[in-house]
Amino acid sequence: MSTARVRAAVVADAPEIARIQRVTWRTAYADLLGEQAIAALDESIEQHWAEAIAHPATTVYVATEGEFTVGFCVAGPAPEDEVANASGTLPEDADRTGLIATLLVEPRWGRRGHGGRLLADAARGLRQRGAERGISWVAESDSASLSFFRRAGWRPDGTVRTLDTGERRLRELRLTGQLDLELAG
């Protein structure tokens, strides 16, 4: 049996992270995002991921199974515009709130605990940086991701936003939860 683990990404992981994003968006999110958004994931996305990995304020984690990279997660401090309520008011704990910006597992590697391990390690990393709670934005129609975060104890906090993908509008719910997670699946 292969060993599954999570580690901090290195710049050399950028091409594999970009591949996972492309495959996952095409396989799991085509109906949500539309072809135009997926087509925009050109070769420059690898450079974007290399820059994200090197950025000192965030940590990119990768999930591996044996020799394969199967998923990734990005975590860091929540920017003010991400943590503010709809009126723009910041909560008292804004400076102690972490953001799970992206968490993707390639669909063929799903249901093996990779997402849970990624979220648990990202939450641990955020706690080590002083965060006390986390937030993440999830498409309202993405029932699989909403269920995943609910199992981790995260819930919608009433804040919504709408993103324009170029050919459709995507309504997202902001989820919030504690960072003392010990998830394995």
Question: Where in this protein do the model-derived segments appear?
Answer:
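Short amphipathic helical patch at the helix-1/turn junction of helix-turn-helix
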Residues: 105, 139-140
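Conserved catalytic-core motifs of GNAT/GCN5-like acyltransferases
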Residues: 80, 135-138, 150, 155-172
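Conserved N-terminal entry element of GNAT/NAT acetyltransferase domains
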Residues: 1-15, 173, 178-185
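Conserved GNAT acetyl-CoA-binding A-motif
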Residues: 126-138
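Acetyl-CoA-dependent GNAT
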Residues: 8-11, 19-110, 116-121, 125, ...
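Short glycine/proline-centered loop/turn elements that form peptide/ligand docking sites
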Residues: 119, 142-145, 164-168
